[in-house]
């Protein structure tokens, strides 16, 4: 049975990967046919499928990181994730649906730090070769206002 401790450890590793700028590893947290979306609470409540960020495969996530490294121009910054404990809604030995509250601080190259996003991850986990992977992650942001500088994944 997939449990909260496994999911909390997974989320900690996920956050560390993003926060330490090991972005090339980020897509490996997902299945090949994953779904990743960043949306806001109002759009999610209304069932609107479009998101601020939307990807439907691990390859799309890899392309996003390639663009981040090679093509996009943005002000240098980094994130620090603060995560709550996960809550499992359903699950068995190989799959689980869970939600986890998050807050992401953005630290600019100048040292200025601000709350960038807060909300909850709505996740569908599966196991592949005994390791947890995200089949789906929807990052539902509390605010309907999104900074245009969402270069890094939440």
Swiss-Prot record:
Classification via SUPFAM superfamilies: NTF2-like
InterPro entries: NTF2-like_dom_sf, SnoaL-like
GO terms classed as biological process: phthalate metabolic process
Cofactor requirements of the protein: Fe cation
EC number: 1.14.12.15
pH dependence (record): Optimum pH is 7. About 20% of maximum TPADO activity is observed at pH 9, whereas no activity is observed at pH 5.
Mechanisms controlling activity: Inhibited by EDTA.
A GO MF term: iron ion binding
Pfam family, one: SnoaL_4
Catalysed reactions, semicolon-separated: terephthalate + NADH + O2 + H(+) = (3S,4R)-3,4-dihydroxycyclohexa-1,5-diene-1,4-dicarboxylate + NAD(+)
Temperature curve summary: Optimum temperature is 30 degrees Celsius. Approximately 60% of maximum TPADO activity is observed at 15 degrees Celsius, and activity is completely lost at 50 degrees Celsius.
Keywords: Dioxygenase, NAD, Oxidoreductase
Similarity comment: Belongs to the bacterial ring-hydroxylating dioxygenase beta subunit family.
Quaternary context: Heterotetramer composed of 2 alpha (TphA2I and TphA2II) and 2 beta (TphA3I and TphA3II) subunits. Part of a multicomponent enzyme system composed of a reductase (TphA1I or TphA1II) and a two-subunit oxygenase component (TphA2I or TphA2II and TphA3I or TphA3II).
Protein's job: Component of the terephthalate 1,2-dioxygenase multicomponent enzyme system which catalyzes the dioxygenation of terephthalate (TER/TPA) to 1,2-dihydroxy-3,5-cyclohexadiene-1,4-dicarboxylic acid (DCD). It can also use 2,5-dicarboxypyridine (PDC) and 1,4-napthalenedicarboxylic acid (NDC) as substrates, and preferentially uses NADPH which is the physiological electron donor.
Protein name: Terephthalate 1,2-dioxygenase, terminal oxygenase component subunit beta 1
């Amino acid at each position: 049975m997939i449990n909260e401790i496994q999911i909390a450890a997974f989320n900690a590793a996920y956050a560390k990967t993003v926060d330490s700028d090991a972005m090339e590893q980020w897509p490996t947290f997902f299945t090949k046919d994953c779904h990743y979306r960043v949306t806001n609470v109002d759009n999610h409540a209304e069932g609107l499928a479009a998101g601020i960020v939307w990807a439907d495969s691990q390859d799309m996530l890899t392309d996003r990181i390639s663009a981040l490294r090679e093509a996009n121009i943005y002000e240098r910054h980094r994130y620090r994730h603060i995560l709550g404990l996960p809550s499992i809604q359903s699950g068995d030995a190989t799959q689980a649906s869970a939600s986890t509250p998050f807050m992401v601080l953005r630290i600019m190259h100048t040292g200025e730090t601000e709350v960038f996003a807060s909300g909850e991850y709505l996740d569908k986990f599966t196991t592949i070769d005994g390791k947890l992977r995200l089949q789906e992650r929807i990052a539902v942001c509390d605010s309907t206002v999104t900074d245009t500088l969402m270069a890094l994944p939440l």
